Amino acid sequence: MKHRGIFITLEGIDGTGKSTQFRLLVEALRRRKLPVRATREPGGTQTGEQVREILLASKTGKLAPLAELALIYAARAQHLGEVVRPALEHGEIVVSDRYNDSSYAYQGYGRKLGVEVVRAFDRIVCGATQPDLTLVLDLSPRVALGRAQGRETRRRSRHGRFEAQGLAFHQRVRRGYLEIARRQPRRVKVVRADRPIAVIQAEIRNLVDKFLTEHESQGGNRNLGLGGRNKST
């Protein structure tokens, strides 16, 4: 069943500045008085945040790839039932920092589980609840990894597990994202992340504006259209 709201996801390898762009986009949409539900994966619910701790903790570095994937989809099932689907059914714009494309890129490509294994989980858990628009922030893995490692050092965080995987892992993840974009160009838009934050955000807002305008022109929920709202804010 097609939902009434709009589902937008932001994706990318670690170190692309994705979470910053996510925050700026959510703030911009809220300034327009649009009904926005901001969330993230892994996380978004109490159960999801607990799973996030398990996944990101350095001490779980030997977690088997299939176990990792199963944990992620367990958290995703809870997230969908508790947050995403109810918000979409109420006509909200759900903006998520990561969703199922992360599983295809990180576990399917990065962990070498393969796309079909991820798809099997996705059919059961996500079903028809797929993103309407996905923005992939793209950056050289070498540059992104340097950023991510610097960030973790500054924060003295124990959540460095994915950054610790090395360059080859992140190169595979990037290839996964670009392959998804190649196969689904209408839904997935690649945004260069090697530019200033403001420039990246301007492109993201333009892509979202275009999508929302097209959505309304095609008979979508008019409460989500830009209408007379100020696009420049």
What spans do the regions from the language model cover?
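Conserved lysine of the Walker
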Residues: 18
